Amino acid sequence: MGLHLNEGGDDLAENHEINVTPFIDVMLVLLIIFMVAAPLATVDIKVDLPASTAKPAPRPEKPVFVSVKADQKLYVGDDQVPAPAQLGAMLDAKTKGDKETTIFFQADKGVDYGDLMEVMNNMRAAGYLKVGLVGLETAAKK
């Protein structure tokens, strides 16, 4: 006859696992807070740039203009540049190889900023570091 004696211990086994439910609840609340707050941090700010009050620099006898039209066509003076890679060669022809010549850069207001920077980088790669940006003089008189 077998007799089973209870030695006074608990019948429930101890649970050695970590309860992650409160941790998940806190993480979900933080996720929701950041999802709501993130769009507020990326508000577009309208910047109305001031007009320059500086006096216009004297114009050289034969200025060299690089222009970007609204249709994304690039010109050196009145001559269209067939490819952006040929900009340096056309500038060399206009300036007779003088890299110290100031290049006047003008662009239509509808041209993307990235396209402007690409043209500026092409001029810099060709060795033309003196670049003047051309704007409307009437904007400075407001």
Swiss-Prot record:
Transmembrane portions of the chain: 23-43
Gene3D superfamilies: 3.30.420.270
Stretches in topological domain Periplasmic: 44-142
Membrane topology summary: Single-pass type II membrane protein
Pfam families, per the entry: ExbD
Homology family: Belongs to the ExbD/TolR family.
Record PANTHER family: BIOPOLYMER TRANSPORT PROTEIN EXBD, EXBD MEMBRANE COMPONENT OF PMF-DRIVEN MACROMOLECULE IMPORT SYSTEM
Subunit structure: The accessory proteins ExbB and ExbD seem to form a complex with TonB.
Protein name stated in the entry: Biopolymer transport protein ExbD
Organism of this sequence: Pseudomonas putida
